[in-house]
Amino acid sequence: MRVNNGLPPQELEAYGISNVHDIVYNPSYDLLYQEELDPSLTGYERGVLTNLGAVAVDTGIFTGRSPKDKYIVRDDTTRDTFWWADKGKGKNDNKPLSPETWQHLKGLVTRQLSGKRLFVVDAFCGANPDTRLSVRFITEVAWQAHFVKNMFIRPSDEELAGFKPDFIVMNGAKCTNPQWKEQGLNSENFVAFNLTERMQLIGGTWYGGEMKKGMFSMMNYLLPLKGIASMHCSANVGEKGDVAVFFGLSGTGKTTLSTDPKRRLIGDDEHGWDDDGVFNFEGGCYAKTIKLSKEAEPEIYNAIRRDALLENVTVREDGTIDFDDGSKTENTRVSYPIYHIDNIVKPVSKAGHATKVIFLTADAFGVLPPVSRLTADQTQYHFLSGFTAKLAGTERGITEPTPTFSACFGAAFLSLHPTQYAEVLVKRMQAAGAQAYLVNTGWNGTGKRISIKDTRAIIDAILNGSLDNAETFTLPMFNLAIPTELPGVDTKILDPRNTYASPEQWQEKAETLAKLFIDNFDKYTDTPAGAALVAAGPKL
C-alpha cells in the first residue's frame, strides 16, 4: 500500500469507497503537471502542454454545465427550505431526488472510484473562517484535482493538519447511470446533492465547472439563512477602500471588468457580504478565453502560465493556442490561482462593504442603454429579473445568443427562493448606502457588441463618481436614467435609439423586450412586495 502524505484509507472507506490502495493527497502543482502530461494517459484524462506553459485539457461533449442533470435529495433537511423546480411559479433546476435513487447513484460513483489511484484535495469555500465550507474533493483524474486546487482556497499546512471536511464531492466522471429512465431522470449523467449527508456526486460529465458551481449552490443555501448575502458577482476594491460588486451571468463581463489595473481584485465570480464586508468564496479565477488577446485583456492573458489549466481550447502542433477558434465550444476557459493576477487583495480575498453595485447584462435585442442609474425599486426589479442574453456555449445546446431571465443573475445556482436573496442584498446595500447601476455589455442598433473600451470607460465613470454627477435624461418605456455624456465614451451610443437607422426600429424592439420583462416578472406578483415592484419595470 502506498499512501501519499498520510491520509488514511479509512477516511475514504467511510464514504463507501473500497479497496483504497493509493491516495495522492493534496498534490503539489509540480506533481499535477507531471501527472497530467503522463504519456500513458488517453482520452479526456490527457493534458497537452501549450507554449504559454499552461496545460490544456478537453472536457468531451460537456463543455458547459448540464443543468438538466442536476438533482437535490428531497428529505427532512430540504423539503421546506429549498426552491424546488416542481413547486411555485419560478423556473429553476432544483429537481427533487428520492433518497433511494441517491443511494443508487452513490453506489455507482463509489464503485467507480474503488480500487483506483485517487486524487484527494482538501480546500475551503469561503474566505471568512466563520462561515466557510471545508470541502474534500475525490477524483481519479489528475486535471480535475488541479482544477479544484486552482479554484478553491488552498489551506495552509497548519489548517490541513486539523482539516475536518464539512462537505464531500465525489467525482465519478467516467461512470454513468444505466437505470436513469426507470428512475425518471433526464439522462444517464447526473450531478446530485444530499444536504443531510453533505455530499455531491458527479457522473458522466467531465466539465470541471460542476464542482465549482456545485459548492456555490451549497453556499447559496447556507449563507442567506444566516442573513449573509450570497452573490453571483465579481468584486474589486479601489485605493481608498471603495468596494464594487459586478453581478452578471456567464459571458457578460464579470471577470473582464473586475480585473482592472487601477483596482485590486477580490474575486471574479462568487462572493458573500456579511457584517464585515464582501469576501470571496474562491481561491482562483475561471475566465472565458474565446477571442482572448493580450492587447484587450492583458491581465487575464498573462495569468495563463504554468499552473493555469486551459479547457477546450485549440492547441496547434507547435503548442501555440488559437484563442479565436470556437469549434469545440464558445465556452473555452482557463482556471488559475488568484495570485496569477498581480493586483489582488492580500493575504485574504476580502474587503469592506460595497458602495457600488453593478448589474451587467448582455442585451441581444439592442434595446437597453450602455448604462443607467437605478432607483431602489428598480434595483430590486432588475435583480429579480436578471435579464441577459444566454451566450454561446456556457450551457450545452446553446450556440446563438438568446434572451433569458435568470433571477438574481444566477438562477441556476439559487437554492432558496429569489426573493430571499433580494431581501438580504437590499438590507446590505441600505446599510452601506450603496448605489446600483445597470450596464449593458451586449449589442446596440449597429448589430455590433458595445466595445470593451467604452464599457471600461463607463465602469470608470461609475467608480470615480462622475456618473452620479452627470446630467441625465429618461429612456421611455423602460424609465431608465441615462447620462447625457461621460468622459471617454462615444456620446452617440449612450441613447440606444441613436444607434438605429430610425427611432421606430428601436421602438419596435423595445416593445418586444418590455413585454418579455413584464411576462417574466408576473411570477413575483403573488406577494404584496413583488406586486409593488411592477411599477419599477417597463411600461407598454
UniProtKB/Swiss-Prot annotation:
Residues the entry annotates as binding ATP: 213, 232, 248-256, 297, 333, 449-450, 455
EC number(s) stated in the UniProt entry for this protein: 4.1.1.49
Source organism superkingdom: Bacteria
GO biological process per UniProt: gluconeogenesis
Record's cofactor remark: Binds 1 Mn(2+) ion per subunit.
GO cellular component terms attached to this protein's record: cytosol
Modified sites of kind N6-acetyllysine: K87, K523
Cofactor: Mn(2+)
Subcellular location field: Cytoplasm
Residues binding substrate, per UniProt: R65, Y207, K213, R333
Chain sites annotated for binding Mn(2+): K213, H232, D269
Keyword Hydrolase: no
Presence of keyword Cytoplasm: yes
Annotated function: Involved in the gluconeogenesis. Catalyzes the conversion of oxaloacetate (OAA) to phosphoenolpyruvate (PEP) through direct phosphoryl transfer between the nucleoside triphosphate and OAA.
Complex and partners: Monomer.
Protein name: Phosphoenolpyruvate carboxykinase (ATP)
